Every structure is written in structure tokens, then in C-alpha cells.
Amino acid sequence: MNNQSATMNTKDNPLGYKKESTLLVGFAIPCIISMLVTALYNIVDQIFIGQGIGMLGNAATNIAFPLSTTCTAISLLLGIGSATNFSLYLGAGEKNESEKYAGNGIVLMALFGIFLFLVTTIFLTPMLKFFGATNDVLPYAKAYTRITAFGFPFLIANTGMSKLILADGSPRYSMISMLAGAIVNTILDPLFIFVFNMGMTGAALATITGQIISFSISLRYKFHFKTIKLSRESFIVSAAHYKKIFILGASACFNQIAMTVVQIVMNNTLSHYGAQSIYGGDIPLACAGIITKVNMIFMSFVIGISQGTQPVIGFNYGAKKYARVGKTYLLALGAASALSLIAFACFQIFPRQIISIFGNGSDLYFKFSERYFRIYMFLTIVNGIQPVTSNFFNSIGKSQLGVFMSLTRQIIFLLPLIIIFPIFMGIDGVMYAGPIADAAAAIVCGYFTIRELKELKKLEINLTKC
């Protein structure tokens, strides 16, 4: 990368000189809203399905949820991978390369979306059974997923393109594209479920309608990039560009894949050990689904903050402004930790009230839900560390550490504990696996972060001497 062009570019681009806290707020808020919209597509369905269909409907959306996280994983792989490269080369003053990463990223989003739709349509029933569907839940899950699969290409493309739009310096446009679809989904859900009596099918139709509208708005931006101009050459397939997109998007993708794997294992564990308890198999599935969706709302804020740092950190690292890189990370970590404290208080004080939003149930249902909520989410207070740290390493081009950070909680700690603990503790083992994994992941991330911040300080000192 050309040092002279990078120095000149930082004078022209506000990412290189504007106050870090101002930039973080400007980029994080649209990212948070974007993440909230993604969460709301799931949680709004869950609320109206719970009120209109009941516990089996809630369990069905939980069974289908791994497919939603798979879509998110793919969109983050391609969206963050292309956007990170986009920012790094833009910061270095190489606009031609930025254009190629944007174009290649969009092509990949389209191809992966169509592929996932075809795979889901062909293997729907065995997939849902693999995800943990019981005989009672399966018909509801099939009715819902058969239709939402049509929206996968639009969901992947829209979520992925929103990262490029953000990296181009248009956080408000990214926010509007996501928000428009969520509003439509929220309006259509009660209309289709309650007025037209369409049940799970209605909820699914409302979801894909919102996704198509969001995609249409994002697609329009392809012709209106501010810092680059896409041409036919930008979309020409390049193995070298694909490879770097995959490398720098892997961290965020693996984090979502890890969530998917954990969700599948957890569903099967809950139904298996639940059947051996007083709760039965369906109550734990429904409760875990609700708690997962509620946690998504909290994590939308945390992940939104971490993603909001990506253009700032990526640009300044490419421009060798290391002090700004470290300061942006610490600001994001502080904001995420403050939100984690608020979430912890809500989860511990108001579990029954939160569960009640998603419909009624038996006393046994609420007893299990409250207990699960309080124990599993007990160390929410440290949950902001891992995603912010993972995104930090990814944004400075250290993808291997980013991937490792993204896997700490879900795969390295939580997954083994979910499998091992219930052998000795029954269904309670799933609950206690959560806080132990949270604590272990926070310690590991803290160690590597302190080491990296010291390295950034050394680089800044050496640069000043030169």
C-alpha cells in the first residue's frame, strides 16, 4: 500500500481526523438499528405467533432459527469481508481495489443466497428434524420455513450490502434500508395471523415481504456509492479477491456459525433431557427460543457497536494512525459494557414480564422460563467483550485472531459444556453452561486484547520517531 497516498487520503476523509467518539456514534447507531431489524424479523414473528398460535408455534420458530443464523453468517462473511477490504484499501488510497472488493462481494451474496434457498427447499424435513423438531412441532416448523426460504437470497444480499454501504460512509442509508423492511413486517404480521387467519404461513409471508423491500432499497445504492464508482470490471470474478473476502469475513461468519451449531445441539439436548424431566420436551424448546430471541435484542446493541468501529478502525489502521485505532476500540468496549450492565439488570429483575410478552403458558412453563433466564444469562455483564474484540482483530486484518476470538464462547467453551453438564445435572446443566462459558471467553479475550493494545502503542511510538 502507498504511504504517500494514504497520508493524503486521511486529510480528505473524516475517518482519519474526526473525533473518535463522534465517528463511533455516527456509525454505531445505524449498525445497531440494522442489527435490531435483523433481530426483529425473528422476534416480531415470535411475539405474534406466541399470541396467535401458542407454545408450539414458539417452539417451531426456535427450530427454524438455525437457518436464520446461517443467513446472517453468510451475509457477515461476505458483507464484512468485502467491507473490511474496502475500508483498508480506501484508507491506503487504492480506490480501484476498493471497487473490486465491493463488486465481487455483491456477486458472492447473490450466489450464496440462491444456493441456500435451493438446499433448504430440497432437504427441508430432514433439516428440521436434525435441528431438534419433535413430532408435534414439525408441521408448524415446515409451514413457516417452506416460505421463509424464498427470502434467504434477499436477506443475505441486503444484510451484506448494508456493510458495504456503511463502509462507504452512508450509515443512515444502511439504516433506512433495514428499517423499512422491519416496519412492513411488523404491520403485516398481525394482519396475516389474526385478520386473515393464516397462522405460521402468514408470519412467514410477512417476513419475506419485508426482506424484499429492504433488499430493493439497498440494491439502489449500487449506483450511488460516494467514494467509488462501480463498473462492469468491478463484478468480474477474481479468485484472489474472493479469498481475501473470505479471510477477513471469517471471524464474524464463524461467530454466527458457532451460534447455529450451539443452537442445534442445545435444541436436541433440551428436548432429550426435557423429556426426562417434569417439563417435557416442548416447554424447554419454547422457552429457550424466547430467551434466544430476547438475547438477540441485547446482542444487537453490542454487535452494532462493534460493527460501527469497523470503518473507523480499518481506515485508520490502513493509514497507520494507531492511536486512533486503540482509542476507538476502548470507546466501543466501554459502551458495550455499559449496555451489558443494563441488560443484566433487566434479565434478573423482569424475567416473567419479558416471557409474558410472547404469550401465555402453564405455571410449569413460566417456572422453567424464569429459572432458565436468571441462570443462563447470569454473566450477561461480560458478554460485550467477545464480539467487540473479535471485530477489532478482524478490522486490523488479523483474521486468525479474529476467528479465534469469535469461537471462544460458542465453540471452545459453551458447546462442550452443553454436552457434558446435562449428563451429570440433567436439564439444569444447559442453564449453568451459559455463565461459565461467558466468564471463560471474557478472560481469554482480555488477555489477547491487552497484548495487542501494547503492540499498537509501540507502533505509534516508532512511527512518531520516524
Say what each PLM segment does.
Residues M1-A28, F86-P153, V195-A250, I313-L379, ...:
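Short alpha-helical transmembrane segments in multi-pass integral membrane proteins
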Residues S21-L40, V44, L67-I74, F150, ...:
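Residue-level signal for short hydrophobic patches within transmembrane helices
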Residues G26-D45, I147, N158, G181, ...:
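Transmembrane helical elements of multi-pass membrane transporters/channels
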Residues I29, D45, S82, F123-L124, ...:
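Hydrophobic/aromatic residues in alpha-helical transmembrane segments
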Residues L40-N58, L128-N135, L191-M198, T260-I290, ...:
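Helix-terminus/linker motif at the lipid-water interface of multi-pass membrane proteins
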Residues N58-L118, L155-S174, N267, L285-P351, ...:
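Small-residue-rich hydrophobic transmembrane alpha-helices
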Residues T70-A73, N185-P190, F215-L219, I297, ...:
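Hydrophobic transmembrane alpha-helices of multi-pass small-molecule transporters
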Residues G79, T148-L166, S174-A182, A203-S216, ...:
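Short runs within selected transmembrane alpha-helices of multi-pass transporters and secretion channels
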